[in-house]
Amino acid sequence: MRCNGMSPVSVAQRNTGIWAVVPLKAPECAKTRLSGVLSHAARQALFFSMASHVIGTLRASPRIASLLVVTPSESTAEMARAAGAEILWGPPDEGMANACSRAMAHIAAAGGERVMFVPGDLPLLDGAAIDMLSRAPVDAIGMAPNRDGHGTNGLICRPGAIPLFFSGPSFSAHQNAARCAGIDVWIVRSREWALDVDLPADLEEFESSIKDAKRRVLCQI
């Protein structure tokens, strides 16, 4: 049964360690910038495939204590629950920064020590990349930029350490916020964190990476 908003968190439910937060749109609203190269059905399939991959990779990481998916979508929530995630409901028109800020407040109430924000469209994300970002000093802001260096594709911090920005030049905005708060910044640059699939060029890069991986496997046979 769906419950709107956040539920009170009792002391018995407190969960320390690193919480991962994955904000996910409703599938019918996702990946609209790929409409020129993918059908509506194909875009939804891509959305679920990447989201499932990200959630599964986070769940498998020994560095992640808990996983919270923020979404307005019943179908997305069903997929996330099946993978072992908790759900925090949000309105359909909620932006990523607001969704993540609400999640951070929920996690702070639950006793979470650190929060890792991860978008649901990172098809190359793996356990090593998660481990790398999670090794940021506890009192620092750990960040991973996207391919063009302007967006933030991964961020780890203490709850409430800085305000969150997930549109426009968010990578520099997060660095400026950390600087204003007197907090050190730890930057991780890797292909696994950098590639998010929003545009046709991103899809081409992903397809190229798959071909490269297959080629490497064949060369080892």
Swiss-Prot record:
Pathway annotation from the record: Cofactor biosynthesis; coenzyme F420 biosynthesis
The answer, when asked if Calcium is one of the entry's keywords, is no
Which residues belong to the signal peptide in this entry? none
User: Which key words tag this protein in UniProt?
Assistant: GTP-binding, Nucleotide-binding, Nucleotidyltransferase, Transferase
What Enzyme Commission number does this protein have?
2.7.7.106
What are the GO MF terms of this UniProt record? GTP binding; phospholactate guanylyltransferase activity
InterPro entries of this UniProt entry? CofC (IPR002835), Nucleotide-diphossugar_trans (IPR029044)
Domain of life per record: Bacteria
Q: Which reaction does it catalyse?
A: (2R)-3-phosphoglycerate + GTP + H(+) = 3-[(R)-glyceryl]-diphospho-5'-guanosine + diphosphate; (2S)-2-phospholactate + GTP + H(+) = (2S)-lactyl-2-diphospho-5'-guanosine + diphosphate
Pfam annotation, one family: CofC
Q: What does this protein do?
A: Guanylyltransferase that catalyzes the activation of (2R)-3-phosphoglycerate (3PG) as 3-[(R)-glyceryl]-diphospho-5'-guanosine, via the condensation of 3PG with GTP. It is involved in the biosynthesis of a derivative of the hydride carrier cofactor coenzyme F420, 3PG-F420. Can also use (2S)-2-phospholactate (2-PL), with lower turnover, and has weak activity with phosphoenolpyruvate (PEP).
Q: Per the similarity annotation, which family is this?
A: Belongs to the CofC family.
Name the chain's protein.
3-phospho-D-glycerate guanylyltransferase
* Organism for this UniProt entry: Mycetohabitans rhizoxinica (strain DSM 19002 / CIP 109453 / HKI 454) (Paraburkholderia rhizoxinica)
